[in-house]
A protein has these predicted regions:
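Substrate-binding cleft of carbohydrate-active enzyme catalytic domains
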Residues: 1-152
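Substrate-binding groove of N-acetylhexosamine-processing glycoside hydrolases
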Residues: 77-84, 88-104, 124-229
Length: 229
């Protein structure tokens, strides 16, 4: 990765790292489950250090990619240790490469309805914090991760969902921590999204799915290769 950064920098290309969270995280979740299973017989505390899932979670959801197990459990302290550790490793690699780190993209998109609803840990956490719904749980995660990165001197980036449906006071707190919000789902009635995000105080980066996603078909004809969602 360090070689990639240096290769890109010589060609005036900025590489933006992304830690997909809390959704789209199946690879990380499964990797940390494997780590847990490998270490639990020796040191349970160490095994749980970066765990991203709760064994008692019975939440029923289906992601846009048809997964039922790709959402980090944001009530787990180990999730925040994981994000802290991974971001530190990213920062170190950029320093070793001698390349400035513009921002870390945290994802934030496509957390399906039903996530966390069957998690005993999430229910307990929400009750303790006086949260009314799981949206407030996701806002807690967002507040904490953006604050953590800010303390490291790193700006946050994210998909459009990170900037939507928050109270004004929350936007006022977190918008300055963002380098940019990537507005991707802007088709039809959603063409208002970039304006909404900008009006909430975030810098907008337009990445309209119909223009910039290279795996989409040019048109929906059956013989045209590519996706048409």
């Amino acid at each position: 990765f360090i070689e990639v950064l240096q290769y890109a920098a010589k060609r005036h290309i900025t590489v933006i790292p992304e830690i997909e969270s809390p959704g789209h995280a199946r690879a990380a979740i499964k990797a940390m489950e494997a780590r847990f299973n490998r270490l639990k017989g020796e040191d349970m505390e160490k095994a749980r250090e970066y765990l991203l899932s709760e064994s008692a979670d019975t939440s029923k959801y289906v992601s846009a990619q048809a997964y039922t197990d790709n959402i980090m459990n944001v009530a787990l302290p180990s999730v925040y240790r994981f994000m802290d550790k991974v971001s530190d490793e990213i920062i170190k690699m950029y320093k070793d490469a001698g390349v400035p780190l513009a921002t870390i993209h945290i994802g934030g998109d496509e957390v399906p309805k039903g996530s966390w609803t069957g998690s005993p840990l999430c229910h307990k956490f929400m009750e303790e914090k006086g949260m009314k719904d799981t949206h407030e749980l996701s806002e807690y995660f967002l507040e904490n991760i953006t604050e953590m990165l800010s303390k490291k001197g790193v700006k946050t980036s994210g998909w459009q969902e990170v900037a939507l449906h928050h109270p004004p006071e929350m936007n006022a707190r977190i918008a300055p921590r963002f380098a940019g919000v990537y507005c991707w789902s802007t088709i039809g009635k959603r063409d208002i999204v970039p304006y909404t995000v900008a009006n909430e105080g975030y810098d907008v980066i337009l990445c309209n799915v119909n223009n910039l996603y290279i795996d989409l078909a040019y048109n929906p004809h059956k013989d045209e290769p590519g996706l048409t969602w």
